[in-house]
Regions:
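N-terminal Lys/Arg-rich, disordered targeting/topogenic segments
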Residues: 1-8
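Activation targets extended, charge/polar-rich intrinsically disordered C-terminal tails
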Residues: 2, 20, 24-51, 55, ...
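Sec-dependent N-terminal signal peptides
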Residues: 8-18
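Short, structured beta-strand/loop micro-motifs enriched in basic residues and often containing a Trp
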Residues: 54-69
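Glycine-rich catalytic cores of cysteine/serine-nucleophile enzymes that process amide/ester linkages
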Residues: 72-148, 171-177
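Structured segments of extracytoplasmic/periplasmic soluble domains
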Residues: 87, 121, 160-169, 188-196, ...
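Extracytoplasmic/secreted proteins, especially bacterial periplasmic and envelope-associated proteins
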Residues: 105-108, 157, 161, 181-188
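A structural motif
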Residues: 148-166
Length: 236
């Protein structure tokens, strides 16, 4: 009897956790969709790069930091302190898992150091799995979301904090504090500077958590339509 009770109790607990995870994922995606749509609704078409199939839409905002820059003929997303996020999971080669991860978790994240440079960590390549500087190539993605900390006064300290983590190994366990995974690197770098500006929900940090956070606002979004036209929404 005790064994049977324990079995059923454990099963209900696991089902409860699964149900919570599903509901939380659905709610997060609804909120994210609303945030993106609200951001896009504020935009006005201001330019078009016909040759490269790009349309630019500006969201007017009081800021000295535009969220896209053109340097030497190339486009770079983000200003110092912005976080770039990819909704798609990094595992397109694994059907079903890729779709589920994309919906419930999201994909990769990067911290913008300057227009041309990001700080990231990638666990797919075990020979190159440390916090490192990267060239900012995020404009080449089919879809990208950029968020900006609402409290801009901490950006300088957060930037120095994340720079201090260069060389730290990837955390494959997601549980122990022996390294970082990409989105965890973003949230930890903010939280260690200012607890009140935390950008996750005090659990395992996902891309969805960061986009959904009340302490960030969307500053950039682009997607590529089925005609391969890239629609770019940015603040200026």
């Amino acid at each position: 009897m005790d064994v049977k009770f324990k079995f059923h109790f454990t099963r209900y607990i696991l089902l409860g956790i699964l149900l919570f995870f599903i509901i939380n994922g659905v709610v997060e995606n609804i909120i994210i969709s609303r945030k993106i749509n609200n951001f896009m609704r504020q935009a006005v078409l201001v330019d078009e790069d016909v040759e490269n199939g790009i349309k630019f839409y500006c969201v007017s905002r009081e800021t000295s930091k535009p969220s896209i820059n053109k340097i030497d003929g190339k486009y770079y997303i983000g200003a110092t302190g912005d976080i770039l996020l990819k909704k798609a999971s990094p595992y397109p080669e694994i059907p079903i898992f890729h779709q589920l991860t994309t919906y419930f978790v999201g994909g990769h994240a990067a911290y913008v150091v300057d227009s041309k440079t990001t700080i990231e960590i990638n666990g797919k390549d075990k020979d190159n799995n440390t916090v490192s500087y990267y060239g900012n190539a995020w404009f080449s993605l089919k879809e990208c979301i950029g968020v900006r900390l609402k409290n801009q006064s901490i950006v300088s300290d957060v930037t120095e904090n994340i720079k201090s983590k260069i060389g730290t190994k990837y955390n494959y366990t997601f549980l122990f504090n022996n390294g970082y995974y990409c989105t965890d690197l973003m949230s930890a770098s903010v939280y260690e500077v200012s607890h009140k500006d935390n950008i996750n929900d005090f659990s395992v940090t996902t891309a969805n958590d960061i986009i959904d956070s009340k302490n960030v606002e969307i500053s950039y979004y682009h997607y590529t339509d089925n005609k391969e036209i890239k629609h770019v929404y940015y603040v200026n």
